Amino acid sequence: MTVHPTAIVSPDARLAQGVEIGAYSVIGPGVTVGRNTFLGSHVVIERDTDIGEGCRISSFCSLGGDPQDLKYEGEKTRVIIGNYNVLREYVTVNRATSADIGVTIIGDHNLIMAYCHVAHNCKLGNHIVISNGSHLAGHIHVDDYAIISGMVGIHQFTRIGAHSIIGGASAVTQDVPPYVTAAGNHAKLYGLNLIGLERRGFSKETISALKEAYRIIFRSSSLRREDALEKVRQTVADTPEVRHFIDFIQTSERGVCH
């Protein structure tokens, strides 16, 4: 463990073997940092934050600050960040409010680029990329392998589906289904994320089934949404991916981009 002499570490913080803390960083009470995690200079982890092993937290990140929510009245809440994440310069991650389970969660193997914001009560999965200057409002869920391009703003309580991609400078106000491409202000759908699906090793048969499901649900103007979902169940190959696609759309509370 290496702590720069100018860093300030609370006696209530716990640092594992191999942790490195750069100059002028501040580690507050209730913070745990896992093995071999690197914190650059001027990093602030305010309080009540768990960071896993093998993470790289770049200069001027601010983690574990109070939620930016007028309903927050000082309740004890947390941030949990998993293993092998990279947070670049000036990323901010806020603690949760007491709503839900009272935790802001970031999973494993994620890349969050410079100047991004992850607000209170967000839940991010694994292998996600969030590009420079994108901002997630409160209570957003982002599923595995999603890609959020630069300068994207996402409305609170929105869900971003697995293996989807959102184009740069988009404004997302409704749920983005899994496996799709979305872009624009306000964001609209532009078909499947074919390049991403191919790179992740989805079979031709699975991609073909998803294409047909997408066509029926989003390009059949004569069908109501519920009728389109039922038609997919009856006519499209019953794969786990198609079932997930249908379930995501059917359980949307904000409505989905289309």
From Swiss-Prot:
Q: Which reaction does it catalyse?
A: a (3R)-hydroxyacyl-[ACP] + UDP-N-acetyl-alpha-D-glucosamine = a UDP-3-O-[(3R)-3-hydroxyacyl]-N-acetyl-alpha-D-glucosamine + holo-[ACP]
The GO cellular component terms are: cytoplasm; membrane
The keyword Cytoplasm appears for this protein: yes
Principal EC category: transferase
Q: Which Pfam families match?
A: Acetyltransf_11, Hexapep
Q: Which cysteines are joined by disulfide bonds?
A: none
Could you state a single Gene Ontology molecular function term? acyl-[acyl-carrier-protein]-UDP-N-acetylglucosamine O-acyltransferase activity
- The protein's predominant localisation is cytoplasm
* Location in the cell: Cytoplasm
The EC code for this enzyme is 2.3.1.129
The pathway this protein participates in, as annotated, is: Glycolipid biosynthesis; lipid IV(A) biosynthesis; lipid IV(A) from (3R)-3-hydroxytetradecanoyl-[acyl-carrier-protein] and UDP-N-acetyl-alpha-D-glucosamine: step 1/6
Could you tell me the Gene Ontology terms of the biological process aspect for this record?
A: lipid A biosynthetic process
- Write the record's keywords in alphabetical order, separated by commas: Acyltransferase, Cytoplasm, Lipid A biosynthesis, Lipid biosynthesis, Lipid metabolism, Repeat, Transferase
What protein family is recorded? Belongs to the transferase hexapeptide repeat family. LpxA subfamily.
Q: How does it assemble?
A: Homotrimer.
Record-linked NCBIfam families:
lipid_A_lpxA, PRK05289.1
Matching entries from PANTHER family are given as: ACYL-[ACYL-CARRIER-PROTEIN]--UDP-N-ACETYLGLUCOSAMINE O-ACYLTRANSFERASE, ACYL-[ACYL-CARRIER-PROTEIN]--UDP-N-ACETYLGLUCOSAMINE O-ACYLTRANSFERASE, MITOCHONDRIAL-RELATED
Q: What functional role does this protein have? A: Involved in the biosynthesis of lipid A, a phosphorylated glycolipid that anchors the lipopolysaccharide to the outer membrane of the cell.
Instruction: Report the protein name in the record.
Output: Acyl-[acyl-carrier-protein]--UDP-N-acetylglucosamine O-acyltransferase
